[in-house]
Every structure is written in structure tokens, then in C-alpha cells.
């Protein structure tokens, strides 16, 4: 019979009355947990962690020293209403990471998906939505209202402008500034960032069939053919690649335009790249 691990709270830590603490939670020295916090089963707060406001931390997430989760948004329009931060299960949140709650003038919640890996000093601003399996390298920063898809990698010391969208499986290089939306499956880098092809290595590691990668490369060339407008290319691509789910994901992403323009290929970019997708 499996033994349940007891919850342990270091005597130097403060857990406000009303906080919901799951089973098998370990709260190390000098942590502070707010009354509105929900800490899932098996969470570990190593030490010196602040969990503020209405913050939920999913099961088996580990948070390292000096991380601050659920602080008020850095937004002058916020009136102080109750807003939330929801962090998924099995995340790793390293030293000095900051994640803020949403604003009461927008969606009111900041959401982080399961299995995220957020390295030291990464920042997720108010009202952002971050998908599953995200990796933020050291110092990667999101402005408010960003939408980040699943399996996205953001390189160290890179900044993503507010309201920017990043599609699934995109690879964002380090020391870069992203002011336009980045399509799914793309590599983007630079200040200001441009597309440098497709994240071919990442797609292979994800198990995408060679035939689908071929169609995706062909669709990429079609969409960004400089002899026509992007709008014309999209209409052509909708008919040409209707049978390819991955190509249609790019087409749908561009068709559902957000508040920002799109990052487009660099003149030096190709239709694929050998850039690795790990730190």
C-alpha cells in the first residue's frame, strides 16, 4: 500500500488563514502564502517564495527561491479588483521568476499551462495565456495580453511585446525583440524579430511525418511568396493545402488576425533551419 506524503510547512513560513494547501505539499523556509491561494498536491516551494493574491498552483509544480507569483499587474488601468493567476501542473519555476495576475479591465486572469519550464528571472505579465510544455529561458519576458501556444521555446533575454501571439511549436531566439505575431512552427530571431524558416528539428522531435514536413515547407513558401500579397497567398494556400492539418494551422493563425502585424521572413531566411530547440 502506498503511503501518502504528509504536507510539511517550515515554521518560518507564513500561510494566511483561508489558503488551500493540498496533500504532500512542501513549503520551505521564509515563504508567504496568501489567503486566496490554492496550492495543489505535491507542490514544493523551496524557500523565499511569495504566492500572492488569488493564485492557483497545479499539482507537482516546483518553485525555487525568490519567485513571486500572483503579484498585482503592472498596469495603471487596473482598479484593484479580484483577478487571478492559474499555473498548471508539473511546472518548474526557477529563481526570481515573476508571474502577475490579470487585470480587472481585461480578461482578469493570467493562465500558464502544464509542464512549463520557466528559467531564472523569466516574467509573465498580466492577462497572458501560455500553453502547455512552454520553455522560457533565463530572462525571457512577456508583456501583457500575450498568447503563447503549446510547445513554444523563448530564448534567454528576449522580450515579447504586449498583445503578440505566438503559435504552437514556435522557436523564438535569444536576445530578440518580438513586436509581431509569430506563426506556428516558425523560428524567429532578431531586433525586431523576423522569421528564419521553420523549426524543422522541433517538428521531427515531435514526430511529425516527413510527408507533412514537406507540405509545411511548401506552404511556408507559398504564404510568403513576395510576388503576391499575403492575403492573396492565403486564399491560394487554403485551397492548395486543405488536406494538411499543420499547414492549415498556419493559415488559420494568420486568418484570425490579432492586434499586431505578423513577423515575416528575413531576406536571409529559408524554409527550414537546423537550429536546435533546447537550451
Curated annotation (Swiss-Prot):
- Which Gene3D superfamilies does the record match to this protein? Hexapeptide repeat proteins, Udp N-acetylglucosamine O-acyltransferase, C-terminal domain
Compartments where found: Cytoplasm
- SUPFAM superfamilies registered for this protein in UniProt: Trimeric LpxA-like enzymes
**Biological process annotations from GO:** lipid A biosynthetic process
User: What enzyme class is recorded for this protein?
Assistant: transferase
Please give the Pfam families that the UniProt record associates with this protein.
Acetyltransf_11, Hexapep
Reactions performed catalytically: a (3R)-hydroxyacyl-[ACP] + UDP-N-acetyl-alpha-D-glucosamine = a UDP-3-O-[(3R)-3-hydroxyacyl]-N-acetyl-alpha-D-glucosamine + holo-[ACP]
**Keyword entries, A-Z:** Acyltransferase, Cytoplasm, Lipid A biosynthesis, Lipid biosynthesis, Lipid metabolism, Repeat, Transferase
Q: EC number(s)?
A: 2.3.1.129
Pathway(s) annotated for this protein in UniProt = Glycolipid biosynthesis; lipid IV(A) biosynthesis; lipid IV(A) from (3R)-3-hydroxytetradecanoyl-[acyl-carrier-protein] and UDP-N-acetyl-alpha-D-glucosamine: step 1/6
Known function: Involved in the biosynthesis of lipid A, a phosphorylated glycolipid that anchors the lipopolysaccharide to the outer membrane of the cell.
What is annotated about its quaternary structure and interactions?
Answer: Homotrimer.
* The protein's name in its UniProt record: Acyl-[acyl-carrier-protein]--UDP-N-acetylglucosamine O-acyltransferase
Underlying gene: lpxA
Amino acid at each position: 500500500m502506498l503511503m501518502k506524503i504528509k504536507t510539511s510547512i517550515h515554521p518560518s513560513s507564513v500561510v494566511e488563514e483561508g489558503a488551500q494547501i493540498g496533500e504532500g505539499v512542501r513549503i520551505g523556509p521564509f515563504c508567504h502564502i496568501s489567503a486566496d491561494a490554492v496550492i495543489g498536491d505535491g507542490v514544493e516551494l523551496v524557500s523565499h517564495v511569495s504566492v500572492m493574491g488569488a493564485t492557483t498552483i497545479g499539482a507537482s509544480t516546483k518553485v525555487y527561491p525568490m519567485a513571486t507569483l500572483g503579484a498585482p499587474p503592472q498596469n495603471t488601468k487596473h482598479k484593484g479588483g479580484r483577478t487571478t493567476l492559474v499555473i498548471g501542473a508539473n511546472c518548474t519555476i526557477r529563481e526570481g521568476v515573476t508571474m502577475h495576475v490579470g487585470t480587472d479591465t481585461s480578461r482578469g486572469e493570467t493562465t500558464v499551462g502544464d509542464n512549463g519550464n520557466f528559467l531564472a528571472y523569466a516574467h509573465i505579465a498580466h492577462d497572458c495565456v501560455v500553453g502547455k510544455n512552454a520553455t522560457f529561458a533565463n530572462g525571457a519576458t512577456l508583456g501583457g495580453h500575450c498568447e503563447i501556444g503549446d510547445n513554444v521555446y523563448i530564448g534567454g533575454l528576449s522580450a515579447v511585446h504586449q498583445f503578440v501571439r505566438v503559435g504552437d511549436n514556435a522557436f523564438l531566439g535569444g536576445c530578440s525583440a518580438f513586436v509581431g505575431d509569430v506563426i506556428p512552427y516558425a523560428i524567429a530571431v532578431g531586433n525586431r524579430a523576423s522569421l528564419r524558416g521553420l523549426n524543422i528539428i522541433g517538428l521531427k522531435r515531435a514526430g511529425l511525418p516527413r510527408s507533412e514536413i514537406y507540405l509545411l515547407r511548401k506552404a511556408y513558401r507559398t504564404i510568403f511568396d513576395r510576388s503576391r500579397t499575403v492575403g492573396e497567398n492565403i486564399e491560394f494556400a487554403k485551397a492548395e493545402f486543405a488536406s494538411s492539418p499543420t499547414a492549415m494551422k498556419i493559415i488559420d493563425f494568420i486568418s484570425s488576425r490579432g492586434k499586431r502585424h505578423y513577423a515575416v521572413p528575413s531576406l536571409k531566411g529559408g524554409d527550414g533551419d537546423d537550429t536546435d530547440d533546447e537550451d
